[in-house]
Design a protein with these regions (language model features):
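Exposed, low-structure sequence patches enriched in small/polar residues
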Residues: 1-309
Length: 309
């Protein structure tokens, strides 16, 4: 029988410098109890290559979380600046332990408590319109730092994962002429292990794209959405640098433009796929997902309007 007692505090601070400038910070705690299977001291032999045994001495894990944000707005200029940061730390984190059985391909998995888990996240965004809000510039960025711990053959392994991303965006809005958005971003994902024999990993991703609408003769619209992704550092069998293009033509007619005929072409280069990287325990998983490919769609939209008299 185990008995636990936790005091879970929380705090909030808000300060308004003015109607256009504010700062707030929060702290809270929470705990997670080990589940039945993690506590059960009976071996699960359903998979002889991975025998799982619980640990009845596990303690609950406790998470401390802090976040803060700052926002400043200039209503006259339409300018916005936002800053955000967060920090999470876990005490007595419940982690898996894996021990290889000598001269076999089998392993024994169990659970233990350990400290050293934390993650830090920060992001910012700056937006500024020009020329009576016809042109808008936006710059944003974000970064993560995650520190994870596993045990392999009773040896502690620390996986330090760092991710950061920068993005630039330009928007053009000319009424009844064009709405256009151009964006580009660069991100990097780096994982470093403390245990020898595990290779460090570094991947990079560069993305750029353009999307918008052009308006002709008050009833004809041409829309487009193009993006290109360039990946490096992934496993060679996963490397894919898709260029994705979508086009549509839209014609509005009838009184008050109540009817719209639209033709869409999706993924015209037939390259739609995605690559992601997940880091957990002593494993790095690269995933490639092939999504719905090139296709076309013709649609008719009729808008019913009820004008009260």
């Amino acid at each position: 029988e185990q008995k636990t007692f936790n005091v879970i505090p929380s705090a909030r601070f808000v300060y308004n410098f003015s109607k256009q400038e504010e700062f707030n910070a929060n702290y809270w705690g929470r705990n997670n109890q080990p589940n039945f299977y993690q506590l059960q001291p009976i071996a699960d032999n359903s998979n002889l290559q991975n025998i799982v045994t619980g640990n009845p001495n596990l303690e609950p894990e406790f998470i401390h979380s802090v976040n803060a944000s700052y926002k400043k707005t200039d209503w006259d200029k339409g300018q916005i600046l936002t800053l955000e940061a967060s920090y999470n730390q876990t005490q007595n984190r419940i982690v898996t332990t894996k021990v290889l059985i000598p001269n076999t391909v089998n392993q024994i998995t169990s659970y233990t408590n350990t400290d050293g888990f934390y993650n830090v996240n920060g992001k910012y965004n700056f937006t500024r319109p020009f020329f009576e809000r016809k042109f808008t510039f936006e710059y944003s960025g974000e970064g993560w730092l995650n520190n994870n711990i596993t045990f392999i053959n009773n040896e502690k392994n620390t996986a330090n994962n760092t991710v950061w991303r920068q993005e630039l965006e330009f928007r053009l809005d000319l009424e009844d002429i064009v709405n256009l958005e151009i964006e580009t971003s660069y991100s990097q994902n780096k994982t470093k292990y403390s245990q020898e024999g595990l290779d460090d990993r570094l991947t990079n991703r560069f993305e750029y794209g353009i999307n918008g609408r052009n308006y002709f003769f008050e009833d004809l619209t041409l829309g487009y959405d193009f993006s290109k992704t360039i990946n490096t550092g992934f496993d060679n069998s996963f490397v894919n640098n898709p260029a994705i293009l979508r086009l549509f033509m839209e014609y509005s007619f009838l009184k008050h433009n109540m009817g719209t005929l639209r033709l869409d072409g999706f993924d015209l280069f037939d390259q739609n796929s995605g690559i992601t990287r997940d880091v957990f325990d002593n494993v790095i998983v690269d995933r490639r997902v092939n999504r719905l490919g090139r296709y076309f769609m013709l649609s008719f939209i009729f808008r019913v309007r009820n004008f009260g008299g």
